[in-house]
Structure formats: structure tokens, C-alpha cells
Curated annotation (Swiss-Prot):
One of its GO terms (molecular function) is ATP binding. Transmembrane segments: none annotated. Its EC number is 6.3.5.-. The gene is gatC. GO terms for biological process: glutaminyl-tRNAGln biosynthesis via transamidation; regulation of translational fidelity; translation. It comes from Deinococcus deserti (strain DSM 17065 / CIP 109153 / LMG 22923 / VCD115). This is Aspartyl/glutamyl-tRNA(Asn/Gln) amidotransferase subunit C. It is an enzyme of class 6 (ligase). SUPFAM superfamilies: Glu-tRNAGln amidotransferase C subunit. InterPro entries: Asp/Glu-ADT_sf_sub_c, GatC. It catalyses: L-glutamyl-tRNA(Gln) + L-glutamine + ATP + H2O = L-glutaminyl-tRNA(Gln) + L-glutamate + ADP + phosphate + H(+); L-aspartyl-tRNA(Asn) + L-glutamine + ATP + H2O = L-asparaginyl-tRNA(Asn) + L-glutamate + ADP + phosphate + 2 H(+).
Length: 96
């Protein structure tokens, strides 16, 4: 069970400023979540092999094979704007 001191600590770590009505709801939600974990803790896992991942995924990568290289003139013709031999694109990150 989450008590007021633990909620204050979690709120501080998460940089949350909780109103009194939010504190009650947050406490109830966290206790509900912890209740689910308690149910999981009670599951008998004897004989179940530990896994690093729930699904065995393997990356299947192909060999890098050099392909067709476009001539600089073709790239320049396709680019919206060129500057100093490089493609100019719109700014995506604003400077502070």
C-alpha cells in the first residue's frame, strides 16, 4: 500500500504537483497497480524456464550489396534545393 510519504516522494521524483483530489486518485491508482503485481507474484512459476525476452526475436539481415549510384547531376535535379554541393532541407529543430 502506498502511504502519503511514499506518494510525496514519487510525486517529487516525477516532478508532479498534485492537488488534494488528485492525491486521492493517484493513491488509489498506484495501489491498484501494485495489487496486480501482487497477483503476479502469487503465480506458481516452478518449472518455467527464465527468459530474457517474452518472444525470441532474431534480426535477419541481408548482406550489404552495392547498388546503383546516382550521378550528381541526377541528385541535383531531384533535390528541392542545393547549396555548396549538398542538399538543403527545411530546419526540423528550432534553436533555443
Amino acid at each position: 500500500m502506498i502511504d502519503a510519504a511514499q506518494l510525496d516522494h514519487l510525486a517529487q521524483l516525477a516532478r508532479l504537483h498534485l492537488k488534494p483530489e488528485e492525491r486521492e486518485a493517484m493513491t488509489a491508482d498506484l495501489n491498484s497497480i501494485l495489487g496486480y503485481f501482487e497477483q503476479l507474484r502469487e503465480v506458481n512459476t516452478d518449472g518455467v524456464e527464465e527468459m530474457q525476452r517474452p518472444v525470441n526475436l532474431v534480426n535477419v539481415l541481408r548482406d550489404d550489396v552495392p547498388g546503383e549510384v546516382f550521378a550528381p547531376e541526377v541528385v541535383e535535379a531531384l533535390a528541392p534545393e542545393m547549396h555548396g554541393g549538398q542538399i538543403r532541407v527545411p530546419r526540423t529543430v528550432e534553436a533555443d
